[in-house]
């Protein structure tokens, strides 16, 4: 272990402190690295990568309300086909992301790909919606679900108090924020353990369903009442694809994955196949015991299923749902903080978010920023509406990211591509993405209008804070002072070298 005498080094153009500047913290330990390089470390193995993806995809939805697909398809067999097709569709998207991730090895995933391909303006729109609304809202919602299931045994006959639910959700987020600030290995261990727990719960449900199936409980597996309207089909796929959301999360932290060219495609392929199999079999298990009417009317399908079959052991499922949501909160925080970090590295968010803690080598400011935004959304009474308004933007941005693949083939054919996808797959994926986003937008014009307004709010922010370079001196000095102060509080510096492109 070596020490640096002084804090953080050279002054950047914006005035933040860098590695060799004399400062008040003397000495400061830093990691034993060649040239004492301060950067995010590649600590994640293939198994860690798989658990990040699986743990991020599987939240509470499959346990609580896997009903959206059934609602729009109208029949059990049609819903199972949509679940399967959605898994295949997500795997195709992940296959395209494997080429992009191995070619553009930057944290930030689709944000980084859009930045490299279409420039800063479109990339900022994606960054704004995802960082300011989608990610913190999603984390707050999953944390609230965790709280409800933890408190349910304490309040068996009524809904848990709202204040208690929100306080416990805040505690959940804060604990995981500490873990993510302390050590990436700790965060990945949490992800591993809670991913195993949720898979164990789903395998219990699947095995119980298999027993029911082999004993002749097949009366609900029909195509009766199947809805064949185009709008209904699109909405059913929209619901199914939403359940698979998270397959691209490993791309957000690719700088911390060991041997990404080898491990990224493997992790994506294994995770997508595993999740698709588990989702389809879990849904089949539910319908061996519950009718479509019971599934649509249940507040928590897995709990109703367990009460019907497991008797005195039915309490296990709510516990596993709580464990599942805790792991999902960790997955969102782990990957989302890297999106803040990636945006700041491109100069589109405050410079402090590029900083790395000098002894723990974690993006502490980015983790804390994500945590604070989630806390703010916990104070809102209508966070579910916010996430619904901009949900279509997520799929549009993923479609634009996949469009980067053929575009870069055309404009930069000499880029090194360790993986080369057949262009048939991105073209099919882009067309399907347009179908499952435009039709629901037509079906829900009011929500779409609100969502578009939220997206358009990024434009004045971009021109005021990103595109405008010659800001008043007083403003710049204020930003420098705040950045230096936060650096000293958190003991963070900017990384030494840029990511590979």
Describe the predicted segments one by one.
Residues 70-74, 78, 154-163, 184-194, ...:
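Transmembrane helix-loop boundary segments of multi-pass membrane transporters
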Residues 68, 90-173, 177-181, 186, ...:
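Hydrophobic transmembrane alpha-helices that form the core helical bundles
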Residues 34, 41-144, 241, 250-251, ...:
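Transmembrane helix-boundary motif of multi-pass solute transporters/channels
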Residues 16, 35-40, 79, 157-164, ...:
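Helix-loop-helix junctions that connect adjacent transmembrane segments
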Residues 1-43, 405-425, 446-501:
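Terminal cytosolic tails of multi-pass membrane transporters
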